[in-house]
Amino acid sequence: MNGREVLTLRDGTSVTLRRVRARDAAALQRLVRRSSDRSVELRFFGPLKELSNEMAERFSTVDGKDRHALVAMDPEDPEEIVGVVRYERKVGADGAEYAALIEDRFQHRGIGIGLTKKLIEAARENGVRYLYALVLRDNAEMLGLLRSLDLPERLRWQDGAECVEIDLS
């Protein structure tokens, strides 16, 4: 995805999608602060009160090929991020790790699936053959999102979580 795109949510709200930028580090920190403890725990596999400056900089620095991330902007405050999806691929690997965080008030409205479909397009363009996500078993929302992609998937247990592998070929 180059530039910006508009995604219409299930309730008719329009949100802008775009690639993450280096200057988004502070907005990513605010997204984590606004998210519930449960949402943060499901994303980071444990409590996290604050996204460190180092983590925020890492998450907002992408190369568009092996590290790629897309964000959804708050329709009422276009400086604020309300959702982020990302993949990260090790050099030379066929697959990339996928992760997402959607602000609670925007969950179940279509941002997660909309961002993920755009991320999959970018992953395919960059030669990523599969995405994998480590998902806690009680994260029904993420498991449902991944299954709703209607792509071939494989499940296995890894490091205390479900590893959901989505085939992009």
Task: Describe the function of each predicted region.
Residues 1-169:
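Long, contiguous binding/interaction regions
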